[in-house]
Every structure is written in C-alpha cells, then in structure tokens.
C-alpha cells in the first residue's frame, strides 16, 4: 500500500497544502485505509473518554458531558461533510451524511443498514456499535441510547432539512432485541 509511494519528511513547515499533496499521491486504497485509521482512533478515544469520565465522575456527569460535546461536534462535522460532498436537502442527502459521518463509521465497529430509503422515509437499524460492544466486553451497563442518541440524529436530520422528523423506534433501555442495538426512522414532512 504506502510502500508504492515513498513518503519522505523534509526540513521546513508542515502545511495543509503540502500534506494534501502527499495524501493525493497515495494509492486510493491506502488513503481509504488511512481515513479508517483516523475514524477508528476517534471511536477509541470516545470509548475511553466515556468510560474513564464515568469512573471518575459518575454516569450522570459523563452522560451530560458527552451530550454537550456531541451537540457541538455533530453540526460541525455535518456542515463540513455537506460542503465537501455538496449534499442537498432530501433524505438521500441525509443517508449519505449518515454513511460518511464519524458517529456511524463502519470501520470503527458499527454494523448497520438502511431498511428503507424513499423520498419520504428513511429507516435504519444499528446491529452493533463500538460503545455497546466495548461496554458489553467490560461488563458495563449499556448506555441509555433512547435518551442519549436522539440529539445526535435530530441534529444531523435538521441540518439537512428542518422538515425531517426523527423517531427512535428501539434503543436501550428498551427490552433487548436480537441483533438490534437501535432502530431509527426519518420522515420528511410536507
């Protein structure tokens, strides 16, 4: 992969333009893997941050801080992705945003699918998420995603189009469903 193109450090400032040229020279496969490394690292940080904050300050404080952080992070990332991908205001644009946003990154441990994609309704099921997987492995209580996750999905949807309504169809602490962490519905209203 990266062996195909030699990366050499030189004396002088490291700039975005210079780094961008190096990235553009990488094989596409290497670049895609590098993006995956960054986003997987992002989720590793999120998992450790949440667990250690919870250990030090309790669950309520950790959940509140997590909510505050995500309420700022989601719009920042969404606007950047919308700009780069030139997304519109329909449910197809929301589906694209969901695929390319860090909170849904497949390589970081998410397994999910769209179960419906139409002009008026988008539905998705998350089968596995990195936080749930990590917490289960550590014998920790799952996060109450029915309360914590709506601001994330509502935020993403409203940035695409204020007329999109978001409904959580299933999430912890709802009774467990086999192979389902959570289910969401996005409906574009008139």
Feature roles, as predicted:
Residues 1-122, 130-132, 136-148, 158-159, ...:
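N-terminal accessory segment detector
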Residues 151-152:
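ATP phosphate-binding glycine-rich loop and adjacent ATP-lid/helix-beta elements
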Residues 155:
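Surface-exposed charge patches
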């Amino acid at each position: 992969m990266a062996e195909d193109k030699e990366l050499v450090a030189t004396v002088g400032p490291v700039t975005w333009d210079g780094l961008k040229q190096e990235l553009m020279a990488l094989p596409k496969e290497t670049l895609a893997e590098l993006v995956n490394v960054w986003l997987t690292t992002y989720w590793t940080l999120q998992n450790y941050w949440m667990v250690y904050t919870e250990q030090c300050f309790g669950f309520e404080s950790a959940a509140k801080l997590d909510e505050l952080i995500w309420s700022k992070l989601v719009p920042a990332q969404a606007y950047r992705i919308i700009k780069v991908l030139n997304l519109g205001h329909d449910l197809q644009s929301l589906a694209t945003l969901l695929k390319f946003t860090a909170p849904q990154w497949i390589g970081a441990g998410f397994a999910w699918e769209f179960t419906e994609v139409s002009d008026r309704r988008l539905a998705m099921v998350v089968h596995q998420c990195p936080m749930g997987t990590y917490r289960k492995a550590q014998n920790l209580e799952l996060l109450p995603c029915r309360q914590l996750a709506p601001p994330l999905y509502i935020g993403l949807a409203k940035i695409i189009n204020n007329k999109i309504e978001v409904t959580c169809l299933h999430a912890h602490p709802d009774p467990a469903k086999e192979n389902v962490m959570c289910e969401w519905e996005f409906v574009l209203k008139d």
